[in-house]
Amino acid sequence: MSSSTEPSTATKVSEPAPIASEEKPKPCCACPETKQARDACMLQSSNGPIECAKLIEAHKKCMAQYGYEV
């Protein structure tokens, strides 16, 4: 029986990829956490751009880390 010891890559959760990443994710997949929170807020609010401004900015900031200008 061989004991397989895998590197602890599972400990890195929700950590953005380095800016100079060789494999840049597609815009739709770059920031799923901030995108989901922003979209949920926009759908549930009557005045999305105002009520969700902080979530929108958080998503823009996340996207900028990957080199996307939103």
UniProtKB/Swiss-Prot annotation:
<protein>
    <recommendedName>
        <fullName>Cytochrome c oxidase copper chaperone</fullName>
    </recommendedName>
</protein>
<feature type="disulfide bond">
    <location>
        <begin position="41"/>
        <end position="52"/>
    </location>
</feature>
<dbReference type="InterPro" id="IPR009069">
    <property type="entry name" value="Cys_alpha_HP_mot_SF"/>
</dbReference>
<keyword id="KW-0143">Chaperone</keyword>
<dbReference type="GO" id="GO:0016531">
    <property type="term" value="F:copper chaperone activity"/>
</dbReference>
<comment type="function">
    <text>Copper chaperone for cytochrome c oxidase (COX). Binds two copper ions and deliver them to the Cu(A) site of COX.</text>
</comment>
<dbReference type="InterPro" id="IPR007745">
    <property type="entry name" value="Cyt_c_oxidase_Cu-chaperone"/>
</dbReference>
<feature type="disulfide bond">
    <location>
        <begin position="31"/>
        <end position="62"/>
    </location>
</feature>
<dbReference type="Pfam" id="PF05051">
    <property type="entry name" value="COX17"/>
</dbReference>
<keyword id="KW-0186">Copper</keyword>
<feature type="compositionally biased region" description="Polar residues">
    <location>
        <begin position="1"/>
        <end position="12"/>
    </location>
</feature>
<feature type="domain" description="CHCH">
    <location>
        <begin position="28"/>
        <end position="70"/>
    </location>
</feature>
<feature type="short sequence motif" description="Cx9C motif 2">
    <location>
        <begin position="52"/>
        <end position="62"/>
    </location>
</feature>
<keyword id="KW-0496">Mitochondrion</keyword>
<feature type="binding site">
    <location>
        <position position="28"/>
    </location>
    <ligand>
        <name>Cu cation</name>
    </ligand>
</feature>
<keyword id="KW-1015">Disulfide bond</keyword>
<dbReference type="GO" id="GO:0005507">
    <property type="term" value="F:copper ion binding"/>
</dbReference>
<feature type="region of interest" description="Disordered">
    <location>
        <begin position="1"/>
        <end position="26"/>
    </location>
</feature>
<feature type="short sequence motif" description="Cx9C motif 1">
    <location>
        <begin position="31"/>
        <end position="41"/>
    </location>
</feature>
<dbReference type="GO" id="GO:0005829">
    <property type="term" value="C:cytosol"/>
</dbReference>
<feature type="binding site">
    <location>
        <position position="29"/>
    </location>
    <ligand>
        <name>Cu cation</name>
    </ligand>
</feature>
<dbReference type="GO" id="GO:0005758">
    <property type="term" value="C:mitochondrial intermembrane space"/>
</dbReference>
<keyword id="KW-0479">Metal-binding</keyword>
<dbReference type="GO" id="GO:0033617">
    <property type="term" value="P:mitochondrial cytochrome c oxidase assembly"/>
</dbReference>
<comment type="similarity">
    <text>Belongs to the COX17 family.</text>
</comment>
